[in-house]
């Protein structure tokens, strides 16, 4: 089966056979063989050969190809949404919004490129100072499974726009979405070798990251994999490495007037996408006392009614499945471990259907757990921590090695200003769901959440490097020579 796309042609992988499954039905959706190290090298060479021609195209010519890609996405919107839904388990309504985000990324990337990495010039004495930007060359893009269309797109589009060529390795859990996305690029008229697709798992990724022919690597995924890549790139300052990883994100709730609005925002923060967004709230900080008790009682009551189901279920559920049975079992194990160490169940996370990766929302009070693990539990399990004062809440929020997102629900602007000042995170929200982000803003974190290479609107920054020039149309002597130099 031809599942790799290299140098403008589909070919079969020569490595290990693997499959993609629907997380609920366990039906096989895609089968193929992984790329071998030799095929990885071939893809990098193809990208290298295509780089000069692509980089030398005018910006407008590259934009035209990107806009044709957007048109192809629109034409295949229903097909792509269905593909995302069946392979990730997310409901069709959410898959459709992901396709919309993929389309919108084109115009946003063009605007960002012009604003952040365009050309600028101005007079400087008898010369002109000019700032331009150049592409790095061949970049590898590693995509995650939670947004298998949108998040790789967030690297690939700005990389191609800047003039780079790309070798794309998607998650081994979502190869079908990647294949369909690449077909949209082919329909757009992207030249051979400019974008190459390598399917495979860990071994394929290691081979690509280690290939000396790449000039950079852009990654979205887990902290564990990101840490491994960072170590692999140690001592290689000539390579650009952009890491966007997860977080153990805190959401503080102050004593607000509108409890219903608070409950709604907590649910949207913790359980959307079955808790599989890197900005999902993992820790909910609630004040001690009667008001906090009432909030939690209402949160548990509403969360217990959340509809969970298959991606194409009608009426549509709010939550679909997690990505795999393995992921579901790991989350259930994490819940059991927390309970064994002193946590108290407020709403048990359950697997309602044996053999399916569906999980119901879980809420547990971990206040009594002496040493809470600072881990990103990537699913619908919300940990509650009760606090006695606002200063203590901020300290607890910052008690993590991560620094992706942090949020506050409060009627007090003064408290938000205090929270914003002391929060150590790249995304800080006030009275909005933690998973909300503006397309015109950067996306990234500090600490174990990234390496200061914010993506989204700031992706242009790591897709090209600045070149500063002093230019004059003719070579002339200055009006005054430097002391100590005599010309006869």
Swiss-Prot record:
SUPFAM superfamilies: ALDH-like (SSF53720). GO terms for molecular function: succinylglutamate-semialdehyde dehydrogenase activity. It comes from the Bacteria. It holds the Pfam family Aldedh. InterPro entries: Ald_DH/histidinol_DH, Ald_DH_C, Ald_DH_CS_CYS, Ald_DH_CS_GLU, Ald_DH_N, Aldehyde_DH_dom, SuccinylGlu_semiald_DH_AstD. Pathway: Amino-acid degradation; L-arginine degradation via AST pathway; L-glutamate and succinate from L-arginine: step 4/5. GO terms for biological process: arginine catabolic process to glutamate; arginine catabolic process to succinate. NAD(+) binds at residues 221-226. Keywords: Arginine metabolism, NAD, Oxidoreductase. Its EC number is 1.2.1.71. The active site is at 244, 278. It is an enzyme of class 1 (oxidoreductase). CDD domains: ALDH_SGSD_AstD (cd07095). It catalyses: N-succinyl-L-glutamate 5-semialdehyde + NAD(+) + H2O = N-succinyl-L-glutamate + NADH + 2 H(+). The keyword Oxidoreductase applies. Belongs to the aldehyde dehydrogenase family. AstD subfamily. Catalyzes the NAD-dependent reduction of succinylglutamate semialdehyde into succinylglutamate. This is N-succinylglutamate 5-semialdehyde dehydrogenase. The gene is astD.
């Amino acid at each position: 089966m031809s599942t790799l796309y290299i140098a403008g042609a589909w070919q079969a992988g020569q490595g290990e056979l693997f499959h993609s499954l629907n997380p609920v039905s366990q039906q096989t959706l895609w089968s193929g063989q992984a790329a071998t190290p030799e095929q990885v090298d071939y893809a990098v060479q193809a990208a290298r050969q295509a780089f000069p021609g692509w980089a030398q195209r005018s910006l407008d010519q590259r934009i035209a190809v990107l806009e044709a890609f957007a048109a192809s996405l629109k034409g295949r919107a229903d097909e792509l949404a269905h593909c995302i839904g069946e392979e990730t388990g997310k409901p069709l309504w959410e898959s459709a919004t992901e396709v919309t985000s993929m389309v919108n990324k084109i115009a946003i990337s063009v605007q960002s490129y012009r604003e952040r990495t365009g050309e600028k010039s101005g007079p400087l004495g008898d010369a002109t100072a000019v700032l331009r930007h150049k592409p790095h060359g061949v970049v590898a893009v590693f995509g995650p499974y939670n947004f298998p269309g949108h998040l790789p797109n967030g690297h690939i589009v700005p990389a191609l726009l800047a003039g780079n060529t790309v070798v794309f390795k998607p998650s081994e859990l979502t190869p079908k979405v990647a294949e369909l996305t690449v077909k949209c690029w082919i329909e757009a008229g992207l030249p051979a070798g400019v974008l190459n697709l390598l399917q495979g798992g860990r071994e394929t990724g290691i081979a690509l990251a280690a290939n000396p022919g790449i000039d950079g690597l852009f990654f979205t995924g887990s902290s564990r994999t990101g840490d491994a890549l960072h170590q692999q790139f140690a001592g290689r300052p000539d390579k650009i490495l952009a890491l966007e990883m997860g977080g153990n994100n805190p959401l503080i709730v102050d004593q607000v007037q509108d409890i219903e609005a608070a409950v709604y925002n907590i649910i949207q923060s913790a359980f959307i996408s079955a808790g599989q967004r890197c900005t999902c709230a993992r820790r909910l900080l609630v004040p001690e006392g009667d008001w906090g008790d009432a909030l939690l009682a209402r949160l548990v009551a509403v969360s217990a009614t959340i509809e969970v189901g298959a991606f194409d279920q009608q009426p549509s559920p709010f939550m679909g499945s997690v990505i795999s049975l393995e992921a579901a079992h790991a989350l259930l194990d994490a819940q059991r471990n927390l309970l064994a160490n002193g946590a108290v169940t407020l709403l048990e996370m359950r697997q309602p259907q044996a053999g399916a990766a569906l999980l119901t929302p879980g809420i547990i009070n971990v206040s009594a757990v002496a040493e809470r693990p600072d881990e990103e539990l990537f699913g619908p399990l919300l940990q509650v921590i009760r606090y006695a004062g606002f200063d203590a809440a901020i300290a607890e929020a910052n008690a993590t090695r991560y620094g992706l997102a942090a949020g506050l629900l409060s009627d007090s602007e003064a408290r938000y200003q205090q929270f914003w000042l002391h929060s150590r995170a790249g995304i800080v929200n006030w009275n909005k769901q933690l998973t909300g982000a503006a397309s015109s803003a950067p996306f990234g974190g500090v600490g174990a959440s990234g390496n200061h290479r914010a993506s989204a609107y700031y992706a242009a920054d790591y897709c090209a490097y600045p070149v500063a020039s002093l230019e004059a149309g003719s070579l002339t002597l200055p009006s005054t020579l430097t002391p100590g130099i005599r010309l006869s």
